A protein has these predicted regions:
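Conserved catalytic-loop position in the HRD/HxD motif
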Residues: 209, 214, 219, 237
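An alpha-helical support segment within catalytic cores of ATP-dependent transferases
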Residues: 23-43, 161-212, 223-230
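Juxta-kinase regulatory segment immediately upstream of eukaryotic protein kinase catalytic domains
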Residues: 1-47
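Active-site Asp-x-Gly
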Residues: 226-275
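Conserved short submotifs of the Hanks-type protein kinase catalytic core
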Residues: 117-129
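ATP/Mg2+ or Mg2+-diphosphate-binding catalytic cores
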Residues: 266-267, 296-320
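Conserved kinase catalytic-core helix
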Residues: 93-101, 126-168, 192-203, 211
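A conserved alpha-helical element in kinase catalytic cores
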Residues: 74-116, 135-154, 249
Length: 320
């Protein structure tokens, strides 16, 4: 695939933005919330390798008439028209899957639709976690237990045993792809080989569970009504979620991003193992399977970034 085929020309977006502003100006809820649509600016974020990938979305904060930030807008690009709609539909499916006590961390848009075939959505405003390293130490100390418990409960609510007939595609194939990756260390490949042996012998009976698949610090937010030091949180960006995903990938991404202390991390891993009915060594098999699935479905994710992530998460798993 050439850069032209996998990139998006930002010059194609201004007509979409103008059409979007016109469409929103006629919506009653926009007026009820006093949102200054005419002033909103949408940004695709930084370029990646000097181009915008075709899965880029435009984002912006919408202020009210008093210039107070009041809402968040997400809009697809003309080459990936359904990106935002797909994100919303996946979040709806996830919210419907979880118990009401656990699905409140998922915010759905209060408005969404299409303009010129390009999907968009507007959400109540949430706030990112702090970038101040001193504040972050206290913030994460409050959040690690509640996010960790939420993760454990989600696995408990959505756990399903994978039928034997599904093992070749669901487990063996991803693990074999790990073994075929030349840039992975021998120890990592050996881990995948051992996982396949445990599966073949029946010592490991794998399960699926809901997987967000990108559960890092940037996708955990604070609701606008919460204070900076809070145990309330929201999880955003469900586009890559899988209702029947591979356990442990979310957990290790979370442990990495939040630099969770070893003792607490070991407890969280054991909680997952207890729910899934597996041994602690099988956590590595789950992680490598999830990494294999990711490697088979990179889409716009650069291969070098995948290799780096996989090595880091595998190395992290050995420390627990």
């Amino acid at each position: 695939m050439t850069d032209t085929e996998k990139s998006f020309d930002p010059d194609r977006f201004p007509p979409v933005l103008e059409a979007l502003k016109q469409a929103l100006a006629s919506i009653e809820e926009i007026h009820q919330r006093s949102l200054a649509i005419e002033k909103m600016v949408l940004d695709p974020g930084p370029m990646i390798n000097n181009y915008y990938p075709i899965d880029v979305t435009y984002k912006g904060i919408i202020a009210d008439k008093n210039n107070t930030p009041s809402a968040f807008i997400l809009c697809a690009n003309p080459m990936g028209k359904t990106l935002v709609r797909d994100n919303v539909e996946k979040a709806q499916a996830v919210k419907a899957l979880l118990h009401s006590s656990h699905n409140q961390v998922i915010d759905l848009p209060f408005l969404n639709g299409d303009v010129n075939g390009v999907s968009w959505a507007i959400y109540d405003l949430n706030f990112p976690l702090t970038r101040n390293r001193w504040v972050w130490q206290l913030q994460k100390r409050l959040l690690i237990p509640v996010v960790g418990q939420w993760l454990t409960d989600v696995v408990a609510q959505t756990r399903k045993t994978i039928p034997d007939k599904a093992h070749p595609m669901a487990i063996f194939s991803p693990l074999e792809s790990i073994c075929c990756e030349n840039e992975f260390p021998r120890e990592m490949i050996k881990g995948a080989e051992n996982a396949m042996k445990h599966l073949a012998s029946g010592a490991w009976i794998p399960c699926t569970s809901l997987a967000h698949n990108d559960l890092w610090r940037g996708n955990i937010m604070l609701p606008s009504t919460a204070r900076i030091f809070t145990r309330q949180f929201r999880v955003i960006d469900w586009a890559g979620a899988d209702l029947y995903g591979i356990p442990f990938f979310d957990l290790f991404k979370f442990l990495q991003s939040f630099t969770v202390p070893r003792g607490y991390g070991k407890k969280m891993i054991q909680n997952h193992c207890d729910i899934l009915g597996c041994r602690s060594m099988d956590a590595t098999g789950y992680l490598l399977t999830a990494l294999g699935v990711l490697g088979q479905n990179l889409n716009q994710f650069p291969h070098h970034a995948y290799v780096k992530l996989a090595k880091e998460l595998y190395a992290l798993s050995l420390t627990y």
